[in-house]
Amino acid sequence: ESIKLSYDTGKKALEKMLQYMETVSQGEAENIRKTIQDLFRQTCILQVKCDPATLVQHDNPRYQVCLRHREFIADYLSVLDCELVHDPQEHIFRITGDGVMTERMSLMTTKLVILLKMIYRDKIMGEGLHATTTNLAEIREYGKNTNLITRRLTGQEWNDALVLMKTHQMIELPGAVANLEDFTPIYIYSTVNVFCSAMDINELVREYQNEMTE
């Protein structure tokens, strides 16, 4: 009986969603499809994006799609065991739940995310909200000072970490990772705090320092 009930509920939800898609224009339906695709790929969508070179901020059209069709997208995601969460403080939409693909970070990528969290915190405390940019030279310096990075990283290690952070909307790069130089600006979004957020930064640093000495 419960299986039949579940099937009927799912069928009704699907019919409702198909009806909804028929009420929007073809272009808007495509926007909804791409936005859902981005949510799964990135896990979050920012309200505002930033150009790291000019610090010019611009509205993200995908965020506006989430706002306009929030109920529909939430219903669609719920069928896939996911939940659409709006975080007004961080100005993001993100997805959580069993249906979300979790990406395992390598130890080095995790360390680099922690370093970015530290740099972001220090910039916010010291220079205000408009100066959350960093660069490879500064990340290396923080790595050396915290003892989280004790050797020269390979190009592949940098690439893996930066691509993952860009994909998940933690940073913005002015171009391809391969073209980054030591002082090319990298913009850090506040979403860097959404990741590894369960512990205090200092606690995280201690944990990963211990991992290196064992």
Q: What are these language model-derived features?
A:
Residues 55-66, 102, 140-153:
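Short helix-coil junctions and helix-kink-helix linkers
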Residues 80-86, 162, 166-178:
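A short, conserved structural fragment
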Residues 91-95, 178-189:
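Minor-groove-contacting beta-hairpin "wing" of winged helix-turn-helix DNA-binding domains
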